A protein has these predicted regions:
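Transmembrane alpha-helices and immediately adjacent membrane-cytoplasm interface residues
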Residues: 48-58
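Catalytic core of membrane glycerolipid acyltransferases/transacylases, capturing the structured
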Residues: 17, 21-42, 53-54, 68-126
Length: 244
């Protein structure tokens, strides 16, 4: 039933939303930053509605660590498709997610994602991946935060909620080259909403923790060299706290 309701809602949202995006495209060009923020707020509202319809209760901690006027690199473990929804609603500034390139084939979704700074990466194409990393660096320099899941794919280990696959170090070039801070994010419970019951949606509780910002300039050379492993350890600690 929830899947049907979400499907109906998305149909209405995308239908009405295309008119809204058209208006923003027409009138928002005089102040593109303000227009982008309005569109991001529209997406956040849509995500909150989907979570409500899906019966998802999000328990968030550390939201005081989310900056309002500073572009950062968010780094999180990846459990399910709902990871995007339960984190995006707490990002205070425009935040673009790095997504799999296959999502680019979904017409309406692609338009929305591009409007809020999302980028599409083909992890099988090294040259294209590097291009996306460079674009991410420029976006951060222009005030748009970037959200990545460095595991590269959803973790399917259901026996250990604190398990995290190896982080791909290349993703962290965004922080290394732009000088932005890194916000570690821990997520628990999203797989139980959808992936564990495909194709059905089950309501439930999701836990999201935003850790204290990591400034690479304050780390020693060894920690900077292995920043992916350092962030992974920080997120693991947050996941352990969620299980306590």
């Amino acid at each position: 039933m929830r899947l049907i309701l979400v499907g109906l809602y998305l149909f209405l949202y995308f239908t009405v939303g295309m008119f809204y995006l058209g208006a923003e495209w027409l009138f928002g060009r005089w102040n593109q930053k303000a227009s982008m923020l309005r569109q991001y707020r529209f997406v956040q509202w849509g995500f909150r509605c989907i979570l409500f319809i899906s019966g998802v209760k999000v328990h968030a901690k550390g939201t005081e660590n989310v900056p309002e006027d500073e572009a950062v690199l968010y780094v999180a473990n990846h459990r399910g498709i709902f990871d995007v929804l339960v984190t995006a609603i707490y990002c205070k500034g425009v935040t673009g997610y790095i997504s799999k390139i296959v999502i680019k084939k979904v017409p309406c979704l692609r338009v929305y994602m591009k409007r809020i700074g999302c980028l599409f990466m083909d992890r099988e194409d090294i040259k294209q991946s590097l291009k996306i990393i460079l674009e991410s660096i420029e976006q951060v320099k222009n005030g748009i935060s970037i959200f990545i899941f460095p595991e590269g794919t959803r973790n399917k280990n259901r026996e250990d909620a604190t398990d995290i696959a190896t982080f791909k170090e290349g993703s962290f070039k965004v922080a290394q080259k732009s000088g932005c801070r890194i916000i570690p994010v821990a997520i628990t419970g999203t797989a139980e909403i959808f992936e564990d019951h495909l194709p059905w949606i089950h309501g439930g509780h999701v836990y999201v923790t935003f850790g204290e910002p990591i400034d690479m300039k304050t780390l020693d050379k060894e920690e900077q060299k292995h920043i992916g492993e350092y962030c992974k350890d920080r997120i693991h600690d947050l996941l352990v706290e969620q299980q306590a």
